[in-house]
Amino acid sequence: MSLTLAIVGRPNVGKSTLFNRLVGKRLALVDDQPGVTRDLREGQARLGDLRFTVIDTAGLETATDDSLQGRMRRLTERAVDMADICLFMIDARAGVTPNDEIFADILRRRSAHVILAANKAEGAAADAGVIEAYGLGLGEPIRLSAEHGEGLNELYAVLMPLADEMEQQAEEQAPETDVDLDPEDEDGEEVAAPHAITREKPLQVAVVGRPNAGKSTLINRILGEDRLLTGPEAGITRDAISLQIDWNDTPMRIFDTAGMRKKAKVQEKLEKLSVSDGLRAVKFAEVVVVLLDAAIPFEQQDLRIADLAEREGRAVVIAVNKWDVEENKQDKLRELKESFERLLPQLRGAPLVTVSAKTGRGLERLHDAILRAHEVWNRRIPTAALNRWLIGMLEQHPPPAPQGKRIKLRYMTQAKTRPPGFVVMCSHPDKMPESYSRYLVNGLRADFDMPGTPIRLTLRGQGDKNPYKGRRKKNAGALAKHLKSRG
């Protein structure tokens, strides 16, 4: 469950006590003095069979300046913006205060889902405060006692339908990946991918990169309008924003994510949460655009982001931004390509495009590179063609014979797309050196025109379950007939 719940409210209403009860650990400092929680704390909550992320926020303050209270308020507002659900707590014994009314109005405007909870509601002394809470216009309040664990069943009953709704939305947005193929579907020709891009199923693209690489500026340029906040301060986009657009008549859903910093430099808890939100955006994408700053490309964090996308099995496009201010473009481009080949060999051949988000130069190339990467990611190769290719690869470079035992590669087929996944039936799969697997993968890339996309190669022994058993007789003999015709 990827649900995120932010607990918000005035200082000292019991937010950290509830946080500790949901998380099951004393991660948040609890004190009777207002303002003890000065940053955001995140934990994995358990409530019945619900599992979700819970954020304990600093107490909402009315200050809007650069004082500590002002910074706490802004931090809390950002948490409200990125959370799926806000649990707004008041102190039932104190009743509704003017500040509660101010913050209820803020939440009505900033959050799609607000749950009102009247905490410290044990005993008759809290009855008047619970009744007052109705006047906030946020629906019926839940009576809670975070200290004694009362009212959690009622909280569960309110959360459960919202969690189900959000899980369904997440499933609808999640791309199909690791799609199993039916070997009976082929007819000897290269099979077109059935995953057409439509307005109902737009191409899902995540734009990721270090802070201030120009992600929001790039998307604003694609949109043709200022939809996202941009500025020179690193990390100005703190949450992942999803926008559905038609880019050159291609329906897309683009995720602009928080810049991903090195962990040691991520000091604000909110920014740490935003990094994990960016990582989630990678999982929801089909194509990941890794945006680099031309002045400082391929830093360690860039490499980690690209490697994460490859490990998640997503198509990758490298875009180098701020190309308009680069003076020696030819030398710089050669340098970039050499660095790419050396530092990211697992993405050999992936598109590398230079762009200027500021001027719009290079956006056509970026659009075409995204479509090309998506097409390769969906590629399917017929079994007969694969086995013709395998024979040639074996003749050119036979597999090794560890301890005198020759490894025999008998048969190959494609088992998955999105990304392409291939299975080789062979003897002694556990003895196959990694270098020979790389030889086969690199050959697949070169000979079947699959640059850059992740390729999964699985070796199976004869004792493993044969996924092709039971194929129709005419298909089972297709390879034999083909080989006979070659003789």
UniProtKB/Swiss-Prot annotation:
| Role summary | GTPase that plays an essential role in the late steps of ribosome biogenesis.
Which positions bind GTP 1?
9-16, 56-60, 119-122
Keywords for this entry?
GTP-binding, Nucleotide-binding, Repeat, Ribosome biogenesis
InterPro entries recorded for this chain? G_ENGA (IPR031166), GTP-bd (IPR006073), GTPase_Der (IPR016484), KH_dom-like (IPR032859), KH_dom-like_a/b (IPR015946), P-loop_NTPase (IPR027417), Small_GTP-bd (IPR005225)
Q: Which domain of life is it from?
A: Bacteria
Q: Where is this region: Disordered?
A: 167-191, 458-487
Question: Coiled-coil stretches, from where to where?
Answer: none
Recorded family membership: Belongs to the TRAFAC class TrmE-Era-EngA-EngB-Septin-like GTPase superfamily. EngA (Der) GTPase family.
- Which NCBIfam families would you find in this protein's record? GTPase_EngA (TIGR03594), small_GTP (TIGR00231)
Answer yes or no on keyword Flavoprotein: no
What do we know about how this protein assembles, alone or with others?
A: Associates with the 50S ribosomal subunit.
Show the ranges annotated as biased composition (Basic residues): 468-487
PROSITE patterns from the entry?
A: G_ENGA
KH-like domain span: 379-465
Using the record's annotation, list all stretches that form the EngA-type G domain. 3-167, 203-378
- Biased composition, class Acidic residues, residue ranges: 167-190
| Cross-referenced SUPFAM superfamilies | P-loop containing nucleoside triphosphate hydrolases
A GO molecular function term, named singly, is: GTP binding
Annotated GTP 2 binding sites: 209-216, 256-260, 321-324
Name of protein: GTPase Der
Q: What is one GO biological process annotated to this record? A: ribosome biogenesis
Protein's UniProt keywords contain Nucleotide-binding: yes
